[in-house]
């Protein structure tokens, strides 16, 4: 595929801790239900899966936030559960209930049926990546992503989201051998999946370990981080003549920051409970940091959003040899006022320039 040269590579350079003129910003779930235009496209598609599995629709919603805001990266519109869906678990999004699987993985016979899916079954994702790259025309980089092996295992075993993770933790403590087998398959599948996204044109990739923080110390390292590391170690790290940065985000994982930073990634995503300055000292600028405004700040109005953006940037401090990508500490709420996002992006771009001077 012939690709246009990047007009704005500030996001990629910040991830690699290279000098940039300002702090780049993008938002987790930036293409989502808080945007009226997203809801209109989803209505045309008929369902979430109808949206995600149609490369043209996926491209359309990926680009929608960039039409509103001068964001520094686009992120592929998809879902972390496409991989287990390709394994035959039957993903469905029930209205008002979120994702659920028709065939959850609960016992030895279920685990025996699991296998790394043929990547051709996920071709719609890679077609979407190619379509988005073409339509971006070098405007900003495109981020690909996947769920971490542990996080997608949570959904596979529970069958849906969970408040207490009773089923997967029952397996963890009672049949750890079964859980390790699931995680091995997930890690291999995720490695292939992300590499296929990179081959299709993703210029950075992110692993969402959304549920890593529900694990006890020691078990996080064994059941989450070890398999995240397997994925990271197997990724294509150079494409189109430049490095493909890898971001790892473990929500609730602040206590393990140093260990996450040592997994081979280029950047660590932080939730809003971690002080950026403290985190920076802990990793000693060995990796870039991404985050970490509380998503609920967006409900405080423009003045509060601008003040909290400045406070977050000040916490990281003068950039120097570090790297900072501004983001929320988790995905943007569907109820967020779109006009306040404009205030956030403007404040980050304007205020951060002084932190990059000299």
Curated annotation (Swiss-Prot):
GO terms for biological process: protoporphyrinogen IX biosynthetic process from glutamate. It comes from the Bacteria. The keyword Lyase applies. Its EC number is 4.1.1.37. Pathway: Porphyrin-containing compound metabolism; protoporphyrin-IX biosynthesis; coproporphyrinogen-III from 5-aminolevulinate: step 4/4. It holds the Pfam family URO-D. Its main location: cytoplasm. It catalyses: uroporphyrinogen III + 4 H(+) = coproporphyrinogen III + 4 CO2. It is an enzyme of class 4 (lyase). It is found in: Cytoplasm. PROSITE patterns: UROD_1, UROD_2. Transmembrane segments: none annotated. Keywords: Cytoplasm, Decarboxylase, Lyase, Porphyrin biosynthesis. One of its GO terms (cellular component) is cytosol. The record marks 79 as: Transition state stabilizer. One of its GO terms (molecular function) is uroporphyrinogen decarboxylase activity. Substrate binds at residues 29-33, 48, 79, 155, 210, 330. Signal peptide: none annotated. Homodimer. Belongs to the uroporphyrinogen decarboxylase family. Catalyzes the decarboxylation of four acetate groups of uroporphyrinogen-III to yield coproporphyrinogen-III. NCBIfam families: hemE. This is Uroporphyrinogen decarboxylase. It comes from Bordetella parapertussis (strain 12822 / ATCC BAA-587 / NCTC 13253). The gene is hemE.
């Amino acid at each position: 595929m012939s690709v246009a040269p990047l007009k704005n590579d500030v996001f990629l350079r910040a991830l690699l801790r290279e000098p940039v003129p300002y702090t780049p910003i993008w938002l987790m779930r930036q293409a989502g239900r808080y945007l009226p235009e997203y809801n209109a496209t989803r209505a045309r598609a008929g369902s979430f899966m109808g949206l995600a599995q149609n490369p043209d629709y996926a491209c359309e919603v990926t680009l929608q936030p960039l039409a509103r805001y001068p964001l520094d990266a686009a992120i592929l519109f998809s879902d972390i559960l496409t991989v287990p869906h390709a394994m035959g678990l039957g993903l469905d999004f029930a209205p008002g209930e979120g994702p659920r699987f028709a065939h959850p993985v609960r016992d030895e016979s279920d685990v025996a049926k699991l296998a790394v899916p043929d990547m051709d079954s996920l071709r719609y994702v890679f077609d979407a990546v190619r379509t988005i790259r073409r339509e971006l025309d070098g405007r900003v980089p495109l981020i690909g992503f996947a769920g971490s092996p542990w996080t997608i295992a949570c959904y596979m075993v529970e069958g849906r989201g969970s408040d207490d993770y009773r089923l997967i933790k029952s397996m963890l403590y009672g049949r750890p051998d079964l859980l390790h087998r699931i995680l091995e398959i997930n890690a291999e599948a995720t490695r292939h999946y992300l590499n296929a996204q990179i081959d299709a044109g993703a210029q950075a990739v992110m692993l969402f370990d959304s549920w890593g923080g529900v694990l006890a110390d020691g078990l996080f390292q064994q059941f989450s981080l070890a398999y995240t590391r397997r994925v990271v170690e197997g990724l294509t790290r150079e494409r189109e003549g430049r490095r493909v940065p890898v971001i790892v985000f473990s929500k609730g994982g602040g206590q393990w920051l140093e260990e996450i930073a040592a997994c081979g990634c280029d950047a660590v995503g932080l939730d809003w409970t971690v002080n950026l300055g403290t985190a920076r000292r802990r990793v000693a600028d060995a990796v870039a940091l991404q985050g970490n405004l509380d998503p609920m700040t967006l409900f405080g109005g423009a003045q509060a959003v601008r003040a909290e953006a400045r406070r977050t940037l000040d916490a990281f401090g003068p950039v120097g040899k570090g790297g900072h990508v501004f983001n929320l500490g988790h995905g943007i709420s569907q109820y967020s006022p779109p006009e306040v996002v404009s205030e956030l992006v403007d404040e980050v771009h304007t205020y951060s320039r002084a932190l990059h001077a000299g």
